[in-house]
Swiss-Prot record:
Family stated for the protein in its record: Belongs to the IRF2BP family.
Effect annotated for changing residue 715 to A: Loss of transcription activity
Residues annotated as signal peptide: none
Substitution effect: residue 372 to R: In NEDAMSS; uncertain significance; no effect on function
Listed name of the protein: Probable E3 ubiquitin-protein ligase IRF2BPL
Sections of the chain in a coiled coil: 85-132, 335-371
Bias type Pro residues, positions: 284-293, 595-604
GO CC terms: extracellular space; nucleoplasm; nucleus
Zinc finger (RING-type): 715-762
Length: 796
């Protein structure tokens, strides 16, 4: 047996798409064997419904009569029959003779067909003139490249002759003695066995569950082609009805019809009395224009059946069962047009909101710095509180979260606050106004789609601190004067505390950032988003700056987008990273001094200034790749001694591990160190007393490797140049960078035994609170220790 024959004998036809599949591509867990492609397309939860629909439709339309080749390999003792080339030629000659007779009969039926199709008379006439010789309205000569089972006139006529001659069941193999030239042999050319898919032979009245097709034998290629194109499946079991009245009684299996026919109303001449149904296990191709083979114009139908409903039926799931097509092309089983329109509008609205968010994040660095001080300060303060939860005033179960702010203005108009809200929480649906999300919440609550709400700020409440139950009106936090930047944000007692729900940490900013930030190698530096760089992988990312900024710099807020996009990556991977760190035998940097984990990093000046804006794709093609990189780096670059003795205030413990030995890993390791600490800031906010621990986490993220620096680092006090990996960084103000001598003097001046605040002399507050940050005792000891041995990456 040749390799081709072995291969064909192993193939099984899918019940829905009728394509020959290898056993590994078939799934047997349902009532009929189906291929993985159909299951994936329809969905495992709906596939049984689709199978039952297909079964009913095939039975209703007489698909299980003679002439269709069966499916799986034959059982033991049953031999398949293959025709030689000579026999195939004789069969083809007989088919041609039958075609001539069938053509004459079909031409008579064309007139009756046209009278029945009042709504489609003109299109029907054009189509009938194009049918290839046979002029049968349903058995079309479709282009072989477009339709899977286009039927030629000769093949269709041969099928008719075969069906008329053969009256016995197609499952009785081997066939009875029939002359080699008879077309009945042609109707069962492909090899197969007596039962479809191994099922027992069904009774004539119920018909087989499906007709599985084998690949044709290599020794009968010509005849098998004729069989597949013309007689595969009991195509025409009845010739024109001599009694007149109806159209010709032709039974054509749906799986042999073009998909444009399957998804549209079937012809009254093609299908028996049962009403037409929409089948189609796949979305159909675009219907051919009227007059072209396979186009809607070829659809014969009873009065009131519209051919245009083909596109309507194809627009919804093809698994809808027993859907009658009405005169207007409406399908009762489909989703109503108003629901479809509403869904379409919602998708468009969400796309527009995401576009606004993307634009806001992309231009934030340039725009926020140029905005008036009141606008900039308000945005910084509000951004430092995100994300936080909001709910609908009338239904507390409807929850969303505010995750970003921006200021917009039209020419000649004042600035107005814009806030971005995700609703429902974790859904990724973004609203760019409070009124928009309040309207949607109202519709979800009251099921009233007509009413709009005047002001969303009156209907939304925010929780000041997660879990406290202290819900306040959003309009009190953001009154009109604040929204138009006439006044500053109310006092700190009104500001919500950031909270990132661990169950749905993915913020919509990630979707926006990832979509516009292609992946880059781990060692690639981040570049500005709008920079027309030739390095496509990093062109959309922001370049990290290590040189000091002006004291009133909005650098932190300018990096909101990147911080947010990193934030939900960290939250997604937080638990895995914690396990990795604990397995590595050292504490997270944020825990190095034994303090509790700090709260989630607010997306404002604090975390943004202190954490370089880097996106997850830079660590690799996926977050998991980045996580693996984290684990590898943590396992080799740190030791328990490092983690406890040198904190990130000095930026040396982790920075030194990324020095000369492996330059390519510098950005990656700095990222890892920041993510280590930051992910501890993600899940639940403890009291502000834990915030001083933040200065362990962030400062090392500000100074960069010389590879990525755009300028020298200088001490804020003495203006001497700083070491790239060894200095003190204020976690609240990015421009506060200090050398060790100045930091040492400041600590001594403040008194090392009490609270020691920023060496600048200011009590720089933590974002979202009035509590100033202070050095931890371990950090003070490190700074006062004088010369610190900077360990190299490969040191024992």
């Amino acid at each position: 047996m040749s390799a081709a024959q072995v291969s064909s004998s192993r193939r099984q036809s899918c019940y829905l798409c009728d394509l020959p599949r290898m056993p590994w591509a078939m799934i047997w867990d349902f009532s009929e064997p189906v291929c993985r492609g159909c299951v994936n397309y329809e969905g495992a939860d709906r596939i049984e419904f689709v199978i039952e629909t297909a079964r009913q439709l095939k039975r209703a339309h007489g698909c299980f009569q003679d002439g269709r080749s069966p499916g799986p390999p034959p059982p033991v003792g049953v031999k398949t029959v293959a025709l030689s080339a000579k026999e195939a030629a004789a069969a083809a000659a007989a088919a041609a003779a039958a075609a001539a007779a069938a053509q004459q009969q079909q031409q008579q039926q064309q007139q009756q067909q046209q009278q029945q199709q009042q709504q489609q008379q003109q299109q029907q006439q054009q189509q009938l003139n194009h049918v290839d010789g046979s002029s049968k309205p349903a058995v079309l000569a479709a282009p072989s490249g477009l339709e899977r089972y286009g039927l030629s006139a000769a093949a269709a006529a041969a099928a008719a002759a075969a069906a008329a001659v053969e009256q016995r069941s197609r499952f009785e193999y081997p066939p009875p003695p029939v002359s080699l030239g008879s077309s009945s042999h042609t109707a069962r050319l492909p090899n197969g066995l007596g039962g479809p898919n191994g099922f027992p032979k069904p009774t004539p009245e119920e018909g087989p569950p499906e007709l599985n097709r084998q690949s044709p034998n290599s020794s009968s290629a010509a005849a098998s082609v004729a069989s597949r194109r013309g007689t595969h499946g009991g195509l025409v079991t009845g010739l024109p009805n001599p009694g007149g009245g109806g159209g010709p009684q032709l039974t054509v299996p749906p799986n042999l019809l073009p998909q444009t026919l399957l998804n549209g109303p079937a012809s009254a001449a093609v299908l028996p009395p049962p009403p037409p149904h929409a089948l189609g296990s796949r979305g159909p191709p675009t219907p051919a224009p009227p007059g072209a083979p396979g186009g809607p114009a070829c659809l014969g139908g009873t009065p009131g059946v519209s051919a245009t409903s083909s596109s309507a039926s194809s627009s919804t799931s093809s698994s809808v069962a027993e859907v009658g097509v009405g005169a207007g092309g409406k399908r009762p089983g489909s989703v109503s047009s108003t629901d479809q329109e509403r869904e379409l509008k919602e998708k468009q609205r969400n796309a527009e909101a995401l576009a606004e968010l993307s634009e806001s994040l992309r231009n934030r660095a340039e725009e926020w710095a140029s905005k008036p001080k009141m606008v900039r300060d308000t945005l910084l303060t509000l951004a430092g509180c995100t994300p936080y939860e909001v709910r609908f005033k009338k239904d507390h179960s409807l929850l969303g979260r505010v995750f970003a702010f921006d200021a917009v203005s039209k020419p000649g108009m004042d600035y107005e606050l814009k806030l971005f809200i995700e609703y429902p929480t974790g859904s990724g649906n973004v609203y760019s106004s409070a009124s928009g999300v309040a309207k949607q919440m109202y519709q979800d609550c009251m099921k009233d789609f007509g009413r709009g709400l005047s002001s969303g700020f009156k209907y939304l409440e925010y929780e000041k601190k997660h879990g406290s139950g202290d819900w306040r009106l959003l309009g009190d936090l953001l009154p009109e004067a604040v929204r138009f930047f006439k006044e500053g944000v109310p006092g700190a007692d009104m500001l919500p505390q950031p909270y990132l729900d661990a169950s749905c940490p993915m913020l919509p900013t990630a979707l926006v950032s990832l979509s516009r930030a292609p992946s880059a190698p781990p060692g690639t530096g981040a570049l500005p988003p709008a920079a027309p760089s030739g390095r496509g992988a990093a062109a959309s990312l922001r370049k990290r700056k290590a040189s000091p900024e002006p004291p009133d710099s909005a650098e932190g807020a300018l990096k909101l987008g990147e911080e947010q996009q990193r934030q939900q990556w960290m939250a997604n991977q937080s638990e895995a990273l914690k396990l990795t760190m604990s397995a590595g035998g050292f504490a997270a940097p944020g825990h190095a001094a034994g303090g509790p984990p700090p709260p989630p990093p607010p997306l404002g000046p604090h975390s943004n200034r202190t954490t370089p804006p880097e996106s997850a794709p830079q660590n690799g093609p996926s977050p998991m790749a980045a996580l693996m990189s984290v684990a590898d780096t943590l396992g080799t670059a740190h030791s328990p001694k490092d983690g406890s003795s040198v904190h990130s205030t000095t930026a040396s413990a982790r920075r030194n591990s990324s020095s000369p030995v492996s330059p390519a890993s510098v950005p990656g390791q700095r990222r890892l160190a920041s993510r280590n600490g930051d992910l501890n800031l993600q899940v639940a906010p403890p009291p502000p007393s834990a915030h001083p621990g933040m200065d362990q986490v962030h400062p090392q993220n500000i100074p960069d490797s010389p590879m990525a620096n755009s300028g020298p680092l200088c001490c804020t006090i003495c203006h001497e140049r700083l070491e790239d990996t060894h200095f003190v960084q204020c976690p609240s103000v990015p421009s506060h960078k200090f050398c060790f001598p100045c930091s040492r003097e400041s600590i001594k001046a403040q008194g090392a035994t009490g609270e020691v605040y920023c060496p600048s002399g200011e009590k720089c507050p933590l974002v979202g609170s009035n509590v100033p940050w202070a050095f931890m005792q371990g950090e003070i000891a490190t700074i006062l220790a004088g010369d610190v041995k900077v360990k190299k990456e490969r040191d024992p």
